[in-house]
UniProtKB/Swiss-Prot annotation:
Presence of keyword Cytoplasm: yes
Gene behind this protein: FAM89B
Self-association state and partner proteins as the record states: Interacts with SKI. Interacts (via LRR repeat) with CDC42BPA (via AGC-kinase C-terminal domain), CDC42BPB (via AGC-kinase C-terminal domain) and LIMK1 (via LIM zinc-binding domains). Forms a tripartite complex with CDC42BPA, CDC42BPB and LIMK1.
Gene Ontology MF: a single term: transcription corepressor binding
Domain of life where this protein originates: Eukaryota
Alphabetized Pfam families for the sequence: LURAP (PF14854)
Function: Negatively regulates TGF-beta-induced signaling; in cooperation with SKI prevents the translocation of SMAD2 from the nucleus to the cytoplasm in response to TGF-beta. Acts as an adapter that mediates the specific recognition of LIMK1 by CDC42BPA and CDC42BPB in the lamellipodia. LRAP25-mediated CDC42BPA/CDC42BPB targeting to LIMK1 and the lamellipodium results in LIMK1 activation and the subsequent phosphorylation of CFL1 which is important for lamellipodial F-actin regulation.
Family: Belongs to the FAM89 family.
Lineage: Eukaryota, Metazoa, Chordata, Craniata, Vertebrata
UniProt entry keywords in alphabetical sequence: Cell projection, Cytoplasm, Leucine-rich repeat, Phosphoprotein, Repeat
Biased composition (Pro residues): 159-169
Entry GO CC: cytoplasm; lamellipodium
Annotated protein name in UniProt: Leucine repeat adapter protein 25
Region (Disordered): 54-83, 141-175
UniProt xrefs under PANTHER family: LEUCINE REPEAT ADAPTER PROTEIN 25
Length: 189
């Protein structure tokens, strides 16, 4: 389960969850990009950002010692040169922007994972309450015969208290994230 309502097309432009704004166009294809694995998606995005940063850095950097020797013979540069402190400030700003973009994607991935976990937990709680309601309706007072096999010297049990229902077991989840969530919050159902 990826947390999407079944009526909506995953990854489409109109993919908006109840109460959440639609994903930006650049992120709309991310929902099913890697089978719902946000950690994998985060890793791919991080690699892509790192490669893009390296390519843009290589395009800005001179060609090494060969360029330096040619520049000494050619005189001043043909185009207007920015001051070194401005270049370093722009490089620092670019680096910070890439870091912020990666942090933003990481937080988005974590938020989406949390949303999916909450939805799974809601479904689990609804299933448990349904089982408890079903169990209590099966053990209601109307299901007991008038004479429950008691002898004359035994007192009948209090009719206002239902008998103890059999213990309910929580269905085992096959999702490691759900198990982590239960372990992290020490949820015992």
């Amino acid at each position: 389960m990826n947390g999407l309502p079944s009526a909506e097309a995953p990854g489409g432009a109109g993919c908006a969850l109840a109460g959440l704004p639609p994903l930006p166009r650049g992120l709309s294809g991310l929902l099913n990009a890697s089978g719902g694995s946000w950690r994998e998606l985060e890793r791919v995005y991080s690699q892509r950002s790192r490669i893009h940063d390296e390519l843009s850095r290589a395009a800005r950097a001179p060609d090494g010692p060969r360029h330096a020797a040619g520049a000494a013979n050619a005189g001043p540069a043909a185009g207007p040169r920015r001051p070194v402190n401005l270049d370093s400030a722009l490089a620092a700003l670019r680096k910070e922007m890439v870091g912020l973009r990666q942090l933003d994607m990481s937080l988005l991935c974590q938020l989406w994972g949390l949303y999916e976990s909450i939805q799974d937990y809601k479904h689990l709680c609804q299933d448990l309450s349904f089982c408890q309601d079903l169990s209590s309706s099966l053990h209601s007072d109307s299901s007991y015969p008038p004479d429950a096999g008691l002898s004359d010297d035994e007192e009948p049990p209090d009719a206002s208290l239902p008998p103890d229902p059999p213990p309910l077991t929580v269905p085992q989840t096959h999702n490691a994230r759900d198990q982590w969530l239960q372990d992290a919050f020490h949820i015992s159902l």
